[in-house]
Amino acid sequence: MLINYLMLLFAAMIIRSFADSGNAIETTSPEITNATTDIPAIRLCGPEGDGYCLHGDCIHARDIDGMYCRCSHGYTGIRCQHVVLVDYQRSEKPNTTTSYIPSPGIMLVLVGIIIITCCLLSVYRFTRRTKLPIQDMVVP
């Protein structure tokens, strides 16, 4: 801990001697006088891009030269020329009221298993109660 205090004291002495000697570094920066205008990263093409994109908007990107298409929903491709085919059965949300109701066949099987199990248990208990005690067999 004493070493940390000595290092801190030594660093403060070096900084003070450097500042007193007149060798201080000027850290102020000159003011910027010319104003810069922000160019949006993506902008619409304008009249030169009319008809370029078949199903979407023609755009210019700031970093890339050329025209590009931002496709409307349901279209894809370089010029939005391809239709995206959607499988409607997979895209629909499941009907929550019917998706959690078990089918009648499954219910019948479960009820049948429960009834058979109850019958077997009752037969087992009945035969266990009425069983005659085993008599010791004596051999003459």
UniProtKB/Swiss-Prot annotation:
Disulfide bonds: C45-C58, C53-C69, C71-C80
GO cellular component, as recorded: extracellular space; host cell membrane; membrane
ATP-binding among keywords: no
Annotated site, Cleavage (By host protease), chain positions: T96, T97
Alphabetical UniProt keywords: Disulfide bond, Early protein, EGF-like domain, Glycoprotein, Growth factor, Host membrane, Host-virus interaction, Membrane, Secreted, Signal, Transmembrane, Transmembrane helix
Statement: the UniProt record of this protein carries the keyword tRNA-binding: no
Extent of the signal sequence: 1-18
An example Gene Ontology molecular-function term: epidermal growth factor receptor binding
Cytoplasmic side: 122-140
Residues with attached carbohydrate: N34, N95
InterPro entries: EGF-like_dom (IPR000742), GF_C11R (IPR011170)
Family listed: Belongs to the orthopoxvirus OPG019 family.
Functional description taken from the UniProt entry: Stimulates cellular proliferation (hyperplasia)and mobility around infected cells to promote rapid and efficient spread of infection. This effect is beneficial for virus replication in vivo, because poxviruses replicate possibly better in proliferating cells than in quiescent cells. Acts by binding host EGFR, inducing its dimerization, autophosphorylation and leading to activation of several cellular pathways regulating cell proliferation or cell survival.
Protein name per UniProt: Pro-vaccinia growth factor
